[in-house]
């Protein structure tokens, strides 16, 4: 803890960079094969994608619901703490739910996943521990394990959330490309802001 602030920043930068470099090698197309098949089968049967998490993964889930939706894969955020109090009703039989929990044993999310499975949803679990309860309940498990969080406490979820986001962003690129989303389609969903600007004919 006696190191300089510059040293702390340098350590985080190096550990985060290494984690992303490792993730880029791990998260090849074959890594996503089962998840892609599950999503494709669900979509063919009229199923929809939902995403949930509690704590920091809640924010990852909220962002990814927006990103998936804006790039050709409609996705609905599901509050992990509200699901067992009625919000699970947004998920119908045949839908797919991504459940994000790094350690994979958060009691509220475990209860949510159990409820969703009982109601006929398929689960893609995103955790850092394949032996965790949420990982084992998943029809598909996407492993986002990291060695360290990048600081001297090694507790606040920094690198684990960074790698989770990287993995899910990569999946969004694959889904976007598989569906052949072009500029015109993207602009239909994102007409405002700087991204929505286009040259007038």
Roles of regions detected by a PLM:
Residues 1-45:
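An N-terminal, well-structured beta->alpha segment
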Residues 19, 34, 39, 172-173, ...:
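Residue-level detector of solvent-exposed, low-hydrophobicity positions
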Residues 40, 48-179:
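Glycine-rich phosphate-binding loops that contact phosphosugars or nucleotide phosphates
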Residues 133-136, 150, 176-201:
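Internal, active-site/partner-interface "lid" segment
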């Amino acid at each position: 803890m006696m190191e300089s602030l510059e040293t702390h920043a340098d350590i985080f930068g190096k550990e985060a960079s290494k984690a992303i470099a490792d993730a880029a090698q791990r998260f090849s197309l074959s890594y996503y094969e089962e998840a892609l098949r599950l999503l494709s089968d669900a979509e063919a049967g009229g199923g929809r994608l939902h995403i949930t998490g509690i704590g920091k993964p809640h924010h990852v889930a909220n962002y990814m619901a927006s990103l998936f939706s804006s790039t050709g894969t409609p996705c609905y955020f599901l509050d992990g703490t509200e699901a067992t109090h009625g919000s699970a009703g947004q998920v119908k039989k045949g839908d797919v739910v991504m459940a994000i929990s790094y350690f994979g044993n958060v009691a509220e999310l475990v209860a949510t996943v159990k409820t969703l499975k009982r109601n006929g949803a398929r689960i893609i679990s995103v955790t850092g521990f394949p032996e965790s309860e949420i990982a084992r309940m998943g029809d598909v498990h996407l492993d986002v394990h990291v060695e360290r969080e990048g600081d001297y406490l090694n507790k606040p979820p920094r690198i684990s959330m960074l790698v989770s986001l990287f993995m899910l962003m990569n999946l969004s690129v694959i889904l976007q490309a598989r569906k052949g989303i072009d500029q015109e389609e993207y602009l239909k969903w994102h007409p405002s802001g700087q991204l929505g600007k286009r040259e007038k004919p």
